[in-house]
């Protein structure tokens, strides 16, 4: 694996790369809100055994530059597309998690002949504009990164390890730490600023998948987590995801191959909870391209 920092129109975007071979197509991995490229640390090494795989820190996240503006989905897509071109990723499979799935769907819609396939990982299909204010408030609460400012490094890691929805594994420490800065006094602060997070959330509130379905001309795989045993809120959101998946199968009329895969008893953070199973689904999507 190697890391890099590439300037795109005055904005430096950080990325990491796994290259185990020259099989086509390459893969672009897009993280979710408040996360970082490191969320793919358990997927990239497997996926990159035969091909080139790039995971990036999107605008305002991780080690990429921070900006006061440019956090609407289509600007984020332009950032990500420009980086893919700068790094020579020709017709990548674009994989997005959570908010990153919103970005991935928009990417495939805005550049329909610039991608080989798209994989939406527990995101991308829920019509946020159709939700009541009360329903949106619940989702917004779940999407927001917890306020960790002022915690020590050890306190932050202890909180991460105590999460009930995600079994702890040693690699999670570095993945979690990639989302924060450790100050000289030992306290931490989020890399994504609160104001930038609020701007992204406003963009998410306006997200309507149907705006992007019609132009998508590549295979689409939708991977969704079923954690409905967690609580009543999780069950309610599961119903929204089911509705969104059904609408996607209907709306993606130009897609030559579209399928929905459910992971039972799985946390929202699929790339770190079920990395092997997720990688298998991405590879299955790539295999369908070989059959065409």
Give the positions of each predicted feature.
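Alpha/beta-hydrolase fold catalytic core
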Residues: 1-27, 49-51, 89-90, 246-250, ...
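Active-site loop/oxyanion-hole signature of alpha/beta-hydrolase fold enzymes
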Residues: 8-11, 16-18, 54, 58-99, ...
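Conserved catalytic-core motifs of eukaryotic protein kinase domains, centered on the activation segment
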Residues: 39-41, 64-70, 129-132, 233
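Helix-rich cap/lid subdomain of alpha/beta-hydrolase
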Residues: 123, 127-214
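Conserved serine/cysteine hydrolase catalytic core
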Residues: 183-254, 262
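Catalytic histidine-centered segment of alpha/beta-hydrolase-like enzymes
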Residues: 263-275
